[in-house]
């Protein structure tokens, strides 16, 4: 499970940076805290199901695309 959190976090940061968003901007767009975004990106914890749709929408993606790891 820890590996999945790290993979998700790495992917989330990559997608956020590719779109030119700061953690603060993503947090505002998803009604999450900056700390939550930071913790997800560092693999400390993964997103709750209800937040996946918010994150995907803010990044203009489908939810499954958040999990397309290399």
Q: What is the predicted function of each stretch?
A:
Residues 1-7:
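A detector for short, charged/polar N-terminal pre-domain segments
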Residues 6, 17-18, 45-46:
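Short amphipathic helical patch at the helix-1/turn junction of helix-turn-helix
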Residues 31-47:
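Recognition helix of helix-turn-helix/homeodomain-like DNA-binding domains
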Residues 50-65:
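DNA major-groove recognition helix of helix-turn-helix/homeodomain DNA-binding modules
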Residues 2, 57, 67-70:
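Short, charged recognition helix plus adjacent turn
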Residues 12, 26-27, 37-40, 66:
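Conserved hydrophobic/aromatic packing and binding residues within compact polymer-binding modules
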Residues 10-29, 54:
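Short basic helix-loop element that most often maps to the first helix and adjoining turn
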